[in-house]
């Protein structure tokens, strides 16, 4: 059976989209078949899409064609009678092309008395599609009720657009389900008895009527709307936690773009999505129009699949049983109201449950009107602490209160894990499944998760009620011990230590030492380096992706190409440069080892020019590379040295900046200056106790030697696998600080795709390209180049995904390069665990080796 469907654009932007398609389609036809006057004549309907064959989940088939009437709602309402005639003309055109049923989208049914008047003049049956649209809105509301865990009697629903056909049918379904309703009707219609007459009398006690939207805002947080006017509800007036289901077009929320509020949710109701079992004509590369299909169009398709040549969904009264019937038939054929969407973007359970706190004041009492009462706040905190949240609840909280983009990114990569416990090299999720951790907090966990000797040292100090934050009213004993140990262990002539809480703070302290001791504002740094994300550290981080949003940064910072001694000599001879910041291995830059002899030459240049040599060992230090300090591989003796990450065994934040005593004296050795740099939490006894224990265990367990031996074995094993696959270009690093460089080339792929389409599609698109303006061509070429780069990054992330999903191994990319996977396991890793990773890596390489070039 063949159907036709008449759609229309619902916004000016969509109208111009249809205009663009029409222009391109006619131009393509002209280039392919030649010019004719008829081709460029005014058309009643604009061709949009032909479905040569639709196959449903049951195996039923149909075919159809969709055309647009190129008018928005306001234009149609301005000439309702004339548009009604054009709709009938359009139906006749479709019937002439073989359509046996025609669906009327949006206003194309409204202008014909919801299809009734149109049906009287139509040569074939018609449907407004409003029954399936209603069903989709109903199912969306039922899903939201379930996710919010509320009962119908607990939360009233506002129905906006009563007694329109969709709102009337939806009201009857919701009342039958137990909801109370606030019905918003058009102003001027105040006959209460007439308005209530559309509903069974048994429901009247659960219904209120109003023509003023202001009455709804304080009463309701759940809304469903389907008016013919649109723009009825002001999103700024909605209560926090409100969920607004815009069931039909035009939008009834007064905003064509998503409102800038994160405490409400606007849902595109009335839409359905086809499952994978449904085939909508020819499909290639899983590219087909299947998601968020308007219910009116989907109803037309479903009726055609059923071979039902009958008028359907006409007039004001849509029988609830017919609504449920068409919904059940649609689901049988593979069309469902899920997933939900907001302004075209898919949303999931988490988007709804983020608002749950606005509905459960018994649990979230601290956010209720009684939040000012101490007892209420205490009850809230106690309730949160007592919870053992499910994984989804934790994702919801993080999404709501910390970083929604991070949650969405990890979900996209199938790496949205939530772990409950950790020990050694293993992390355990709430199902008790173990994951091998090859990231180790980006170098924080050299001793593994919760190293018992360090945990014991922490417990013992707390059990003894040892003092912690006393460093500004007395001298902290444990911190003094730690400073001595660090100065004795570190290379160079270290004599002073400043303690902080992180690597980037340690870098900030080093920069201040350099400025204060030399009197020079400038610091040289290396391209592709990474030293942290505070403003000072960013100023000497050699990667624009981290810096561009925070400019202007510090002046007088000088970037030098990595490995270029001539450029470095020029920079160090500048009058305003007093220090050079380097990493022994560029970790976040992609695990790059300097060229042989480079670091010794760098040190010599610093000595010749009198420039301070500052070495960032935040990630490379404390055994990671097979030496206690990575700079020892090259015999480097820094003037300033930075440590953090594994200094406390990953248990307590700590950073340390070591320097020569004479530098400290120049910077801070006067009555006015000895306290000009400080940190509230830096230098506390508790962190120092833990750090002393961590340092002892690194040495006692010979993790430095273990890292050297296991790292050499690991690198060799990975390199042998990499040699078999051209998309793994290099395995590099030292000790247990390794990086796997991927190079799955997509250069030219997007360009080839564009040329292929230009060649195969009707018309002369190559000539069209020639006459695009130069700036347009330049932007398109740049977009194609970046897209090809993104495809390579996507391929690399598939390794992260597959290692996690298929092998329960955690890895991640480096901060500066999305085509390098970091391998930084705890230094306690066993040979068997390394072999497990090597085997998994080999398997993933083989599985992703469809293309070898």
Swiss-Prot record:
Assigned EC number: 2.6.1.-
InterPro entries: Aminotrans_3, Aminotrans_3_PPA_site, Class-III_PLP-dep_AT, NAD(P)-bd_dom_sf, PyrdxlP-dep_Trfase, PyrdxlP-dep_Trfase_major, PyrdxlP-dep_Trfase_small
Family annotation (PROSITE patterns): AA_TRANSFER_CLASS_3 (PS00600)
Cofactor section: pyridoxal 5'-phosphate
Record: residues binding pyridoxal 5'-phosphate: 503-504, 680
Keyword Iron in annotation: no
CDD domains in the cross-refs: OAT_like
Pathway this chain belongs to: Antibiotic biosynthesis; prodigiosin biosynthesis
Record's keyword terms, sorted: Aminotransferase, Antibiotic biosynthesis, Pyridoxal phosphate, Transferase
Alphabetical GO biological process terms: antibiotic biosynthetic process
Pfam families: Aminotran_3 (PF00202)
Function text: Involved in the biosynthesis of 2-methyl-3-n-amyl-pyrrole (MAP), one of the terminal products involved in the biosynthesis of the red antibiotic prodigiosin (Pig). Catalyzes the transamination to the aldehyde group of 3-acetyloctanal, resulting in an aminoketone, which spontaneously cyclizes to yield the dihydro form of MAP (H2MAP).
Protein name (Swiss-Prot/TrEMBL): Aminotransferase PigE
């Amino acid at each position: 059976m063949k159907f036709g469907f008449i759609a229309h654009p619902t916004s000016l932007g969509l109208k111009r989209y249809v205009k663009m398609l029409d222009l391109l389609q006619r131009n393509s036809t002209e280039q392919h078949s030649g010019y004719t006057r008829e081709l460029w004549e005014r058309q009643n309907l604009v061709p949009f899409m032909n479905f040569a064959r639709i196959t449903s989940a049951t195996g039923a088939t149909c075919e159809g064609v969709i055309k647009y009437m190129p008018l928005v709602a306001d234009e149609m309402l301005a000439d309702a009678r004339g548009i009604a005639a054009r709709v009938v003309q359009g139906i006749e055109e479709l019937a002439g092309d073989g359509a046996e049923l025609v669906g009327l989208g949006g206003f194309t049914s409204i202008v014909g008395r919801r299809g009734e008047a149109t049906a009287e003049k139509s040569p074939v049956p018609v449907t407004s599609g409003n029954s399936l649209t209603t069903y989709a809105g109903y199912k969306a509301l039922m899903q939201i009720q379930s996710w919010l865990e509320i009962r119908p009697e607990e939360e009233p629903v506002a129905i906006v657009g009563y007694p329109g056909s969709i709102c009337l049918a939806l009201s009857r379904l919701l009342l039958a389900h137990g909801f109370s309703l606030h019905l918003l009707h058009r102003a001027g219609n105040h006959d209460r008895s007439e308005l209530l007459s559309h509903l069974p009398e048994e429901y009247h006690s659960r219904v209120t009527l109003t023509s003023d939207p202001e009455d709804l805002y304080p009463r309701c947080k759940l809304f469903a709307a389907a008016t013919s006017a649109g723009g009825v509800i002001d999103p700024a007036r909605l209560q926090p936690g409100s969920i607004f289901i815009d069931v039909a077009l035009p939008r009834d929320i007064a905003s064509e773009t998503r409102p800038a509020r994160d405490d409400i949710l606007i849902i595109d109701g009335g839409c359905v999505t086809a499952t994978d079992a449904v085939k909508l004509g020819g499909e290639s590369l899983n590219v087909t129009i299947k998601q968020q299909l308007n219910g009116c169009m989907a109803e037309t398709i479903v009726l055609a699949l059923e071979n039902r040549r009958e008028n359907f969904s006409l007039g004001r009264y849509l029988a609830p049983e017919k609504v449920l019937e068409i919904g059940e038939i649609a689901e049988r054929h593979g069309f469902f109201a899920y997933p939900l969407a907001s302004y075209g973007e898919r949303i999931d359970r988490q988007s709804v449950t983020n608002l749950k706190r606005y509905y459960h004041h018994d649990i979230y009492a601290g956010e209720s009107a009684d939040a000012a009462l101490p007892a209420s706040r205490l009850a809230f905190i106690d309730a949160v602490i007592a919870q053992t949240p499910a994984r989804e609840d934790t994702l919801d909280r993080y999404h709501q209160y910390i970083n929604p983009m991070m949650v969405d990114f990890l979900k996209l990569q199938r790496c949205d894990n939530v772990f409950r416990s950790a020990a050694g090299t293993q992390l355990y999720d709430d199902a008790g499944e173990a994951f091998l951790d090859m990231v180790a907090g980006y170098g924080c966990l050299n001793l593994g998760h919760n190293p018992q000797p360090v945990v014991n040292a922490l417990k013992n100090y707390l059990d003894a009620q040892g003092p912690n934050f006393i460093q500004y009213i007395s001298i902290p004993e444990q911190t003094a011990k730690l400073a001595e140990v660090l100065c004795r262990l570190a290379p160079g002539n270290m004599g002073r230590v400043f303690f902080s809480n992180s690597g980037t703070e340690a870098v900030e302290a080093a920069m201040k030492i350099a400025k204060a001791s030399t009197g020079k504002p400038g610091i040289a740094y290396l391209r592709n380096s990474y030293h942290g994300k505070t403003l000072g550290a960013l100023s000497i981080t050699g990667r624009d992706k981290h810096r561009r949003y925070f400019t202007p940064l510090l002046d007088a910072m000088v970037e030098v190409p990595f490995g270029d001694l001539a450029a470095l000599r020029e920079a160090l001879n500048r009058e305003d440069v007093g220090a050079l910041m380097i990493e022994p291995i560029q970790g976040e830059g992609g695990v790059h080892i300097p060229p042989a002899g480079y670091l010794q030459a760098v040190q010599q240049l610093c000595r010749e020019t009198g420039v301070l040599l500052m070495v960032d060992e935040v990630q490379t230090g404390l055994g990671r590379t097979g030496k206690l300090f990575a700079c020892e591989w090259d015999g480097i003796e820094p003037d300033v040295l930075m440590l953090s990450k594994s200094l406390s065994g990953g248990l307590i934040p700590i950073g340390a900046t070591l320097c020569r005593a004479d530098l400290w004296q120049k910077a801070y050795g006067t009555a006015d200056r000895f306290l000009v740099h400080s940190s509230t939490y830096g230098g506390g006894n508790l962190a120092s106790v833990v750090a002393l224990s961590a340092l002892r265990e690194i040495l006692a367990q010979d993790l430095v030697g273990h890292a050297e031996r296991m790292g050499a074995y690991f690198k060799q094993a990975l390199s042998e696998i990499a040699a078999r696959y051209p998309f793994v270009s290099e395995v590099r690093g030292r000790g247990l600080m390794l990086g796997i460089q991927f190079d799955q080339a997509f250069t030219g792929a997007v360009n080839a795709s564009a040329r292929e389409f230009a060649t195969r599609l009707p018309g002369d698109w190559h000539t069209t390209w020639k006459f695009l303006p130069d700036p347009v061509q330049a932007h398109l070429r740049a977009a194609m180049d970046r897209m090809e780069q993104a495809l390579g990054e996507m391929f690399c992330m598939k390794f992260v995904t597959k290692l996690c999903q298929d092998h329960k191994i955690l890895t991640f990319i480096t901060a500066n390069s999305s085509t390098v996977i970091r391998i930084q396991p705890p230094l306690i890793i066993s040979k068997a665990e390394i072999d497990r990773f090597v085997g998994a890596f080999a398997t993933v390489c083989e599985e992703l080796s469809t293309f070898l070039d």
